Amino acid sequence: MAIDLNRLRANFHVAVAKRKRADQLTLLGKSDAKLPSSPANARLETFPNPAPKRNYRIHFETDDFTSICPVTGQPDFARIDIDYVPDRLCVESKSLKFYLASYRNERAFNEAVTNHILEDFVKACRPREVIVTAQFSARGGIALTVRAEYPDKE
């Protein structure tokens, strides 16, 4: 039985590279991780896209989003949907959960929050395209939905 040393070396290097990428994820599998106090302290973690040559969509959604109205100080509740086509990197979902939770004490208008989420998402993973939709619960009888897209449509 002949052993292909080149193939063995290649498999070893692939396994080491995968382990290094997994080691870079600081939240996944860690039950003692603390929520960041603000979006500025939060970090969206990424991992390599397993199919970078294919256009496919990833959809995240949560109805557990809260930020603070900058005028009244009252909480604004929202459903956040993020739909994106990854390029080289994908966003790890637990880091996204922690990132979104970091807005709980953030005073900002709904439009600013939605656009900031989009900007941070694009900065983290440089997707081919992404749409962030934030459906804020009614306050004063009016519900508000904000949709921000990348790349900008002309």
Tell me what each language-model feature is:
Residues A2-E154:
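N-terminal intrinsically disordered, cationic/polar leader segments
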